[in-house]
Amino acid sequence: MELTNVYPWEDLIKLKIQESAENYLETILILSRRNPYVRSIDIANELAFSKPSVSVAMKNLRENGYILMDDQGHITLSSMGKEIAETMYERHTMLSQWLMYLGVD
């Protein structure tokens, strides 16, 4: 069976966008634990992405209610965004610990 028969292309694109959004949200969570505030440039530096790419992503996250941005460009997670970010962070932490337990680097 071909992949296109299982998932329409539009659904694959949506899945990729969701994964990307989750990664951005998790990165914002991690940065907010290290720094008093998070800016787009901090996210770009952390992920080694271009500033324009991050700006587009932040616009989408803001429009979908996952983040808040003040007049100075400081980014905070909304309650919905924080819930997703914490879930992703916990999953990644648990997976990393499990792989380390198994002896995988």
Regions found by a protein language model. Name each.
Residues 73-91:
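Basic, amphipathic "hinge/linker" alpha-helix immediately C-terminal to the N-terminal HTH DNA-binding motif
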Residues 17, 77, 104-105:
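Alpha-helical hairpin
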Residues 8-49:
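N-terminal helix-turn-helix DNA-binding core of bacterial DNA-binding proteins
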Residues 93-105:
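Amphipathic alpha-helical dimerization/coiled-coil segments
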Residues 39, 87-91, 98:
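N-terminal intrinsically disordered, low-complexity, charge/repeat-rich segments that act as generic
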Residues 1-6:
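Long, low-complexity, charge-rich intrinsically disordered regions
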Residues 40-71:
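Canonical helix-turn-helix DNA-binding module
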Residues 27, 57-60, 66, 80, ...:
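Residue-level recognition of specific faces of alpha-helices
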